[in-house]
Amino acid sequence: SITSNCMIVNLQLGVWTGHRLDKAASKKVTDDAGAEDDAARVNKHLVPKEALKAISNAQGQIRLHFYDRTLPWKDNGDRILTRVMFQRFIEEHGALKEKFNDAVIDFLKNEYPVVVQKAEFRMGELFKRDDYPTPRELKDRFYANLDIDAVTEAKDFRVSLDKADREQVKSDIEAAMQ
């Protein structure tokens, strides 16, 4: 049955964007333009896009792997994975997560301190030191977590599918893993 041959997986990814709304600059822009207060917003890019590129690429690889190797189950992001494919999936996910974590560590140790040091010049009058979290504060903003649960919803029609339909679901999942 699906309850004994499959599991539910859900991926949560988080990345600090390096963007920050500047209310004072937004007010200045609208005042200078003679516009209403809600006519414009100034969103500062605290770090150059290039600085987060390795992290963004690693995050994209994790997401792509997750969607390639699983099938939709619920609208909340839950996806289904066969137990047969689980070990391979976890090994691949682990390798991708390691690359992601390595990119985060490299950014926090090597790139971020340099970016912050250059920010006063780069940002001009928009620079505010308080906009820049410490590396320790930033660390928790980057994550790639995988929740794994059993298929336990006895009321769910997919759990009580006949053998042919269960085999089709299993086949679809395994084909997604190819």
Which residues does each predicted region cover?
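Acidic, low-complexity proline/glycine-rich segments
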Residues: 132-163
